């Protein structure tokens, strides 16, 4: 009797196994596609004017252009002179016409149209992304010592943190948004261990835990940023306890 029961159980298990093998396989849902990497819009045609030995003259032109409703900033060029760039035009002719009107009104004298291929980002295909990253860091270093002012985007009034990062990126041909929160949203998330020169790092310096501060990573655990009011743009270490506790994430745009 015992043997009969054992045989019955074995036959039942075999039948179940056959049915299981013959049943239709369940359809496996495909994995959702990866979200496409975000990318910044490239700068178009920009007007460059002025070649000043004294920074104060570049500051005055920058502020005058802002009064005309133009986004303007100035920088120290390779020849040691301060120059001003402003505008972001879709075509060279649009930039030329605007520059001509400004010259006719006496606001600027000679001008030069910066073309998209003149920017560091346009040279990435030839020299590689490393070249662009080094250019971003070099540009950021040129602003060390400038005073901080919330909402400021000129070297006269100073830079706030996101004004600095926006200007550095735009001078290299990448149209980074104005505010730290939108800069955070516009980039691709990366782990802290994946940071490379030119990436942006973000902090929550307010009590609400939201993005409120940004800096440009320059390698070896350091970054350049515009700190609190009354201080100047400087190099800081990510291991500093203040920033280590408030680090919220990093973004790359390259």
What are these regions (language model features)?
Residues 2-149, 154-197, 208-211, 219, ...:
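Acidic/polar low-complexity segments and flexible, solvent-exposed patches
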Residues 215:
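Flexible loop/N-cap segments at domain edges
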